[in-house]
Amino acid sequence: MLIYDLTYEELEEFIVENGYKKFRADQIWNWLYKQKIEAFSEMNNIPEDIIKLLNDNYTFAGLETVIKNTSADGTIKFLFDLKDANLIETVLMSHNYGMSACVTTQVGCNIGCSFCASGVLKKKRDLTAGEIVAQIIRAEKESGVRVSSIVIMGIGEPFDNYKNFVKFISIVNHPKGLAIGARHITVSTSGLVPKIKEFAHLGIQVNLAVSLHAPNNEIRSKLMKINDRFKVEEVVDAIKYYIHVTNRRVTIEYIMIQDLNDSVETAVELAKLLKGMNVYVNLIPYNTVKEADYQRSSLENRLAFHKTLKEHKITAILRKEQGHDINAACGQLRSQNL
């Protein structure tokens, strides 16, 4: 078992159950998340018997960096090799408010979005909470920067690995560790309706983003197989439920694809669908991938779409393009190396 799989409370319980004082857990946690050690033997204020105990029961993630690409805009994309030889991706993105990490939750993905490179390689397994945590640790060490926010938007559907990604949040959010505030963490889902409703009752102030990408079932079904299970209307109802329970705004993710979902008429339809909801729309320039025969929406169309939403009183932003020159779209780097 990975040491990063333990919450602070679980580590404390383990230490106490083995006859040691609670403060030792505090020391170990500090070594893990402040000093970012990669071997228990590096903890020079921990007795040797505790180090032996840890070595006998836990391991480090052992992520090996296969590829590290840096974009002209400062985006850094990592391809990591797990201990079982599976490959995952992590991306660091530079913003004016700090460095954001986009983490992966699964090896492969079963959602099967037609525009995405991740779905070409089907899901092999879920990542543990510790394997998700390890991406942050490794990315920080490799880049020399501190991650101040997290987006759970890498390879995989987080709500299909619900228990582990929720545990991951509790670990990185702990004030004595990485201390990344809940409001600086965003989880993105393709629209697993039951899990959206369950997440509403979790009681943490993590941001929710929903990949909608279309205002109707005809277009969305072309883009996302998940729409065969959960129609647009069901997803929107789940979003309304989440907003009602949490009183929190939801981000609507909308990848703009030329001549498919980027017309002014489609923008009007989207505005009507979202009317009166506490949401904002994130308009995303499509990162072309060789696995899909789609093209990025023209700047003219993106601007017109954005203008139309604003005219209909829908808050929307045109997301800045990042990492296009290093294949930073989800799943691209992994698919090229398998």
UniProtKB/Swiss-Prot annotation:
EC number: 2.1.1.192
Binding site for [4Fe-4S] cluster: C109, C113, C116
Catalytic activity, reaction form: adenosine(2503) in 23S rRNA + 2 reduced [2Fe-2S]-[ferredoxin] + 2 S-adenosyl-L-methionine = 2-methyladenosine(2503) in 23S rRNA + 5'-deoxyadenosine + L-methionine + 2 oxidized [2Fe-2S]-[ferredoxin] + S-adenosyl-L-homocysteine; adenosine(37) in tRNA + 2 reduced [2Fe-2S]-[ferredoxin] + 2 S-adenosyl-L-methionine = 2-methyladenosine(37) in tRNA + 5'-deoxyadenosine + L-methionine + 2 oxidized [2Fe-2S]-[ferredoxin] + S-adenosyl-L-homocysteine
Main location: cytoplasm
Gene Ontology CC annotation, any one: cytoplasm
Cofactor section: [4Fe-4S] cluster
Binding site for S-adenosyl-L-methionine: G156, E157, S188, S211, L212, H213, N287
Single GO BP term: tRNA methylation
Family annotation (CDD domains): Radical_SAM (cd01335)
Active-site residues per Swiss-Prot or TrEMBL entry: E89, C330
PROSITE patterns in alphabetical order: RADICAL_SAM
Location within or outside the cell: Cytoplasm
Keyword entries, A-Z: 4Fe-4S, Cytoplasm, Disulfide bond, Iron, Iron-sulfur, Metal-binding, Methyltransferase, rRNA processing, S-adenosyl-L-methionine, Transferase, tRNA processing
Cystines in this chain: C102-C330
Protein family membership: Belongs to the radical SAM superfamily. RlmN family.
Reported function: Specifically methylates position 2 of adenine 2503 in 23S rRNA and position 2 of adenine 37 in tRNAs.
Name this protein carries in UniProt: Probable dual-specificity RNA methyltransferase RlmN
Protein's organism: Acholeplasma laidlawii (strain PG-8A)
Organism placement in taxonomy: Bacteria, Bacillati, Mycoplasmatota, Mollicutes, Acholeplasmatales
UniProt gene name: rlmN
